[in-house]
């Protein structure tokens, strides 16, 4: 919500609020209101219910039109009811209460009000479902495949030894790589915490905690952006940008904070290509310094890359003093399929 409001993103957040988790009622787990959360970020809150379909459709239309016209986010809360158990047979609610929800259900109401229309919709739905199931039955199964993940552990990589006689810092080499890629490809964008240099809010030079991005925010305006300290959120946004055809490079200030990014990588970025039958590409690069012996304390000095090894469709690369960082980044930018 914060990022959407801050960057004026025309997005509609649809919250289907059925008032319960698996068995825990919202009154036991939520303090305050959904509307209050939206207002805290300056986002308009709209509310409707599946109990009144006409009103729901009208509210949805208002939300869509306002988001497009004003180019701002909207939080649309749809109050609804869960008619069945959360997953299988684990519903411990009062049967009489559940029955009252069934009576309110719009589909059940339609069956009573207009049985002809109801039956027409059911018939069309059954035909569609039957058609899809038939396609699945006729398609090739995955059983004949040993794995649906490409074998890349033995991939040959063209590499060259880093010439230690070259008088250039590793960070400077990374900077040159980023600058060259941004020059040659307008789809390359940089996101991260404190990566901008001189801007309207702070005139002094900065360019990242380790000075990797330097003056890139001045050389490529609107393509280098400071973000809030919201690692999970900015990783999700970067993943979405990659799916949309951009080439985002996300900087996480310290490798220790990659624990906050893990869920977005494991459950989303690395899975999308397989989930969508190779029709989706996620050319996302996440860069982060890791390691100890710098006196930064127990939460800024860890090397946790091992926790990411073994995730399908994710390249994990560790820079070292024997390889030219520029070459590594050039190779990473050529990967247009999956995250690095």
PLM region descriptions:
Residues 3-6, 147-338:
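Thiamine diphosphate
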Residues 69-73, 134-145, 183, 187-188, ...:
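Intrinsically disordered or highly flexible coil/loop and linker segments, enriched in small
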Residues 103-107, 113-118, 138-139, 171, ...:
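Short, structured coil/loop segments at alpha-helix boundaries
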Residues 127-161:
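Terminal amphipathic helices with adjacent charged low-complexity linkers/tails
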């Amino acid at each position: 919500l914060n990022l959407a409001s801050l960057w004026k993103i025309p997005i509609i957040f649809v919250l289907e609020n059925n008032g319960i988790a698996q068995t825990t009622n919202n009154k036991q787990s939520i303090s305050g209101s959904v509307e209050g959360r939206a207002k805290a970020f300056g986002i308009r809150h709209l509310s409707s219910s599946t109990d009144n379909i006409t009103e729901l459709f009208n509210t949805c239309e208002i939300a869509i039109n306002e988001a497009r016209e004003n180019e701002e986010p909207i939080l649309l809360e749809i109050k609804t009811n869960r008619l069945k158990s959360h997953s299988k047979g684990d519903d411990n609610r009062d049967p009489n209460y559940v029955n009252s929800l069934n009576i309110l259900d719009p589909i059940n109401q339609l069956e009573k009000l207009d049985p002809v229309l109801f039956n027409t919709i059911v018939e069309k739905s059954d035909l569609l479902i039957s058609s899809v199931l038939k396609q699945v039955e006729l398609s090739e199964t995955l059983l004949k495949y040993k794995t649906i993940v490409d074998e890349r552990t033995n991939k040959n990589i063209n590499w060259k030894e880093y010439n230690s006689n070259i008088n250039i810092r590793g960070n400077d080499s990374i900077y040159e790589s980023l600058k060259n890629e941004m020059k040659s490809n307008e789809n390359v964008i940089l996101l991260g915490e404190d990566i901008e240099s001189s801007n309207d809010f702070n005139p002094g030079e900065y360019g990242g905690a380790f000075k990797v991005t330097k003056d890139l925010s001045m050389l490529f305006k609107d393509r280098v952006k400071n973000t809030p300290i919201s690692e999970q959120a900015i990783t999700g946004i970067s993943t979405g940008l990659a799916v949309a055809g951009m080439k985002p490079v996300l900087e996480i200030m310290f490798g220790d904070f990659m624990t906050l990014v893990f869920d977005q990588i494991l459950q989303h970025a690395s899975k999308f290509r397989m989930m969508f039958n190779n029709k989706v590409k996620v050319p996302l690069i996440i860069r982060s310094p890791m390691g100890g012996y710098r006196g930064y304390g127990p939460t800024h000095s860890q090397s946790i890359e091992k926790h990411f090894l073994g995730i399908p469709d994710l390249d994990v690369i560790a820079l070292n003093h024997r390889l030219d960082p520029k070459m590594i980044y050039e190779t990473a930018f050529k990967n247009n399929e999956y995250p690095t």
